[in-house]
Amino acid sequence: MSNKLEQLRKLTTVVADTGEIDAIKKYQPEDATTNPSLILKAAQIEEYAPLIDASIEYAKAQSNDKAQQVQDTCDMLAVNIGKEILKTIPGRISTEVDARLSYDTEGSVAKARQLVKMYNDAGITNDRILIKLASTWEGIRAAEILEKEGINCNLTLLFSFAQARACAEAGVFLISPFVGRIMDWYKAKEGRDFEASEDPGVISVTDIYNYYKDYGYNTVVMGASFRNIGEILELAGCDRLTIAPALLAELEAAEGEVVEKLVDSKGSKERPAPMSHAEFLWEHNLDAMAVEKVAEGIRNFAVDQGKLEDMIAAKL
């Protein structure tokens, strides 16, 4: 019998949640996802130094203003890392919009267009890019605009059913519901561990997946933010799963049968009317975990973006 990673690949598209080229080469995922924290981590790897230098050179050619140079360097660095990753995968790279734009639809759209233009100028076509946006109301509206322009989006920091429903209704390409961070919240609140089958994060993604399939939404469900391989295996059959290198290694080393847990119902139920802004805010607000985790996630990504900018500013 093949290892659990090989078996999982037969049921689910496996994506690598990393900006590290060596890990991507090793595990040969279909796609890869990055975020500000992963870009910061990658930027500290010695082999990426030439990418930072090239990004600084680009930024200096665009503007004489130091603050603008820092912004342009960070954007180009994310794109340069994405370009390197694309050399090693057949599918798509997810590159994230600055988390500080999470409540700014126009700002998010402008930043997304800028990132896509940088990729396009380097010969990378839109069908190899996903733009990551936070699943705030403003982020979802930005994605709705971008999707109509042929820019596919990956809606991240998704913790509530309201967020998932609003994303489907906006016609976004893909969502990344977080599993481990949901479990973290309940573990801290209830002071106990959860079996994978009763893990609140696993249950959340399962409910979203089943809802999408029952109502015939085309939005791809990509489970994210895993704490252990038990969570991953409980979601075998999900459209995609984005997995950190350490957990890919664990799956590769694990023997035993992988059972398909999520099955596409291929339903065609009559869809409800799209949520209004007020309905979205109310439904999302009823989920205390989601409210806390979205805010925390945005803050943490913004902190890491700031650290990256400080690192770049010191090199300019």
From Swiss-Prot:
Which Gene Ontology cellular component terms are annotated?
A: cytosol
Its Enzyme Commission number? 2.2.1.2
Catalytic reactions on record: D-sedoheptulose 7-phosphate + D-glyceraldehyde 3-phosphate = D-erythrose 4-phosphate + beta-D-fructose 6-phosphate
A Pfam family found in this protein is TAL_FSA
> Which biological pathway?
Carbohydrate degradation; pentose phosphate pathway; D-glyceraldehyde 3-phosphate and beta-D-fructose 6-phosphate from D-ribose 5-phosphate and D-xylulose 5-phosphate (non-oxidative stage): step 2/3
What molecular function does GO assign, one term?
A: transaldolase activity
List the Gene3D superfamilies hit by this protein, alphabetically: Aldolase class I
**Active site annotated at which positions?**
K132 (schiff-base intermediate with substrate)
Give the top-level enzyme category.
transferase
Supply one GO BP term: carbohydrate metabolic process
Kindly give the SUPFAM superfamilies that the UniProt entry links to this protein.
Answer: Aldolase
Q: Where in the cell is it found?
A: Cytoplasm
Which keywords, in A-to-Z order, does the entry hold? Cytoplasm, Pentose shunt, Schiff base, Transferase
InterPro entries documented for this protein:
Aldolase_TIM, TAL/FSA, Transaldolase_1, Transaldolase_AS
Disulfide bond is among the record's keywords: no
Q: Which family does it belong to?
A: Belongs to the transaldolase family. Type 1 subfamily.
Q: Which HAMAP family match?
A: Transaldolase_1
State its role.
Transaldolase is important for the balance of metabolites in the pentose-phosphate pathway.
Question: What protein name applies here?
Answer: Transaldolase
| Natural source organism | Vibrio campbellii (strain ATCC BAA-1116)
Q: Source organism lineage?
A: Bacteria, Pseudomonadati, Pseudomonadota, Gammaproteobacteria, Vibrionales
